[in-house]
Design a protein with these regions (language model features):
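Secretory-pathway lumenal glyco-enzymes, predominantly type II signal-anchor Golgi glycosyltransferases
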Residues: 2-409
Length: 409
């Protein structure tokens, strides 16, 4: 009987405990729901930010079907064509720094030391592009007569596995005396070899040059504006171009810019200049060449030369708005204010040349800028590498902090 009396007295205690547990569970469910909602919002922000970071010019992105985990797994095992895990990346093996390795070399090009030497990296088969360049911005008459400084232009090529093409290069060299050909197979993954061969050849044949420019055969170079830029701001150490910051290696083996982890394991590349066109003083060229001889090869030429080698040589790459790695508006006043224009085929080389030199077009005193090119450049600081805008990262960080605070309530 005493026990029966005690039961009702214990019931309120049990009831209160149940209500407390119910409230606790309700609070936990609410926090969990809020957490899921915030994670969903983060996901919606993250996905467009990720995709907007891909190249607006080249459009090569990883397949949506591949998860980041699978890309990281593949990156540790997938071999880069021509540069497998066991392939030596010691440049001295290929460059032979103590020997002359060039098959073809222009004679007398630096008998009078140039103020500016432009080396155009060209593919063996791209004769039409070289002809267009010789007829426009590298026109020999203009180079010899119109500028207050000595400017020389030469084309750098590797070898083809097609003997017919190699024979045509010999004929072209005999006709124009402006071709440097080195002993390596001219492929995309050998572009670093090509640029280091450029440094070697210049150091051996044109070491009294004041400035060296490296560019490609799909580029229009505004030589008068480049000369004006170099002369107005002379520096003993110059490494100038379109600066790319905080770029991340691509881990998708199907991508053109795939970087296997056995070649580069860091999360980001050092700041570097777009390989479409950059200029250096000869002192810097010498430092970069010496750094390359002791830096393991990386097949991405611009990352290697102006990033890794520049970092080792303690040379800082500097951005200049006149350089760009995208196409520009075909506006004469825009083109006149651009040092380099990218993605120019042979026919457009003539079109741009005519527009730039059309005396009937008068540009006002204000510098006209290609806003579209700048917008593209800012939204994807490097064509082909994963980059996030600083503003987007700050937003994601802020939302993450708020999320953690709410969940902890």
């Amino acid at each position: 009987m005493d026990r029966l009396r005690l039961l009702p007295m214990d019931l309120p205690t049990i009831t209160v405990s149940t209500i407390g547990n119910t409230k606790s569970k309700s609070s936990f469910v609410r926090r969990l729901t809020v957490g899921f909602v915030i994670l969903a919002v983060l996901g919606l922000l993250y996905v467009p930010a990720y995709h907007s970071a891909q190249s607006p010019f080249l459009g090569e992105t990883p397949s949506p079907a591949e998860s980041p985990g699978s890309l990281h797994s593949l990156a540790s095992v997938a071999q880069l064509p021509g540069w497998s895990y066991n392939t030596s990346r010691d440049l001295c093996v290929y460059i032979h720094p103590g020997n002359t390795t060039s098959i073809l070399s222009p004679t007398g090009i630096c008998s009078l030391p140039p103020y500016l030497l432009i080396i155009v990296c060209s593919a063996v088969a791209n004769q039409e592009a070289r002809t267009a360049i010789r007829s426009t911005w590298a026109n020999k008459y203009n180079l010899d007569n119109l500028y207050n400084f000595t400017v020389k232009v030469a084309f750098l090529l590797g070898q083809s596995d097609n003997d017919t093409l190699n024979n045509l290069i010999v004929e072209e060299s005999s006709q124009y005396n402006d071709i440097v050909q080195e002993r390596f197979l001219d492929t995309y993954n050998n572009l670093t070899l090509k640029s280091v061969m450029m440094l070697k050849w210049v150091m051996s044949n044109c070491d009294q040059t004041k400035y060296l420019m490296k560019t490609d055969d799909d580029m229009f170079v505004n030589i008068p504006l480049l000369l004006q830029t170099l002369h107005s701001k002379p520096k003993t150490e110059t490494l100038l171009g379109s600066l790319i910051c905080n770029a991340r290696p691509i881990l998708d083996p199907k991508n053109k810019w795939y970087m296997p982890k056995y070649m580069y394991s860091e999360k980001t590349y050092p700041n570097y200049l777009s390989g479409t066109g950059y200029v250096m003083s000869m002192g810097v060229a010498s430092k970069l060449y010496q750094a390359a001889l002791v830096t393991p090869l990386l097949h991405l030429e611009d990352v290697y030369i102006t990033g890794l080698c520049a970092k080792r040589a303690k040379v800082r790459p500097v951005n200049h708005p006149g350089f760009g790695y995208g196409p520009r508006k075909m506006d004469p006043c825009v083109l006149r204010n651009a040092i380099t224009t990218h993605k120019v085929n042979a026919s457009n080389m003539y079109v741009i040349w005519i527009k730039v030199n059309n005396a009937s077009v008068i540009c006002n005193n204000r510098t006209r800028v290609d806003r579209k090119s700048i917008t593209l450049s800012r939204s994807s600081r490097n064509a082909g590498y994963y980059v996030f805008k600083k503003k987007t990262i700050n937003r994601l960080c802020a939302i993450s902090i708020v999320s953690l605070w709410i969940i902890s309530l």
